[in-house]
């Protein structure tokens, strides 16, 4: 079953990107990745998909709160969409199901955006080879990427089909933001201003 935003978007072009994650919370690095991804890949639409029930870790903020923050941050941005698909689907949130879902809706092979650190354990992802077949993997830089690239090359082999984004390195992490908030430090510059105060209070406890 399609959401309202998905139904209204079916007449868009076929260059579709999927940007999944816990977004616990969404931060300025996520916004940077979105802007560069839209521009570099010339996407018709970038769909941000917060995880509902992650297979390997638990989130701190509930889905509804993370989804609300994402809507506040991205709703006014052109070609951006925030989807609650993984909550509507229910069960464990495996990326391959999300890829297959949007691939069927838009009748295209989508771009699937992940951080560079994901390359260090990508072979542990559920049906990871299907992810590589059914989407074009797009990797944005985080920290020092060389060890991740070497590991991915050993495990995955040819990386020529993977798109590595040429953009500033994303140094910030949601874990760091939660810790700063816990210590009562400002999150100015770390999270978008639209949600900063709310995020500081929520994780400040």
From Swiss-Prot:
Keyword field contains Nucleotide-binding:
yes
> Per its UniProt record, what CDD domains does this chain match?
NMNAT
Between which residues do disulfide bridges form?
A: none
Which SUPFAM superfamilies would you find in this protein's record?
Nucleotidylyl transferase
Determine if DNA repair is one of this entry's keywords: no
**Pfam families, alphabetized:** CTP_transf_like
- The protein's superkingdom reads Bacteria
Pathway given for this chain reads: Cofactor biosynthesis; NAD(+) biosynthesis; deamido-NAD(+) from nicotinate D-ribonucleotide: step 1/1
Going by the record, the broad EC class of this enzyme is: transferase
User: Recorded E.C. number(s)?
Assistant: 2.7.7.18
The entry lists its GO molecular-function terms as: ATP binding; nicotinate-nucleotide adenylyltransferase activity
Instruction: Please give the catalytic activity noted in the UniProt record.
Output: nicotinate beta-D-ribonucleotide + ATP + H(+) = deamido-NAD(+) + diphosphate
Single GO biological process annotation from the record: NAD biosynthetic process
This protein's UniProt keywords = ATP-binding, NAD, Nucleotide-binding, Nucleotidyltransferase, Pyridine nucleotide biosynthesis, Transferase
The record's section on HAMAP family has: NaMN_adenylyltr
Q: What biological function has been recorded for the protein in this entry? A: Catalyzes the reversible adenylation of nicotinate mononucleotide (NaMN) to nicotinic acid adenine dinucleotide (NaAD).
Give the protein family.
Answer: Belongs to the NadD family.
- Give the protein name, as stated in the record: Probable nicotinate-nucleotide adenylyltransferase
**Record gene name:** nadD
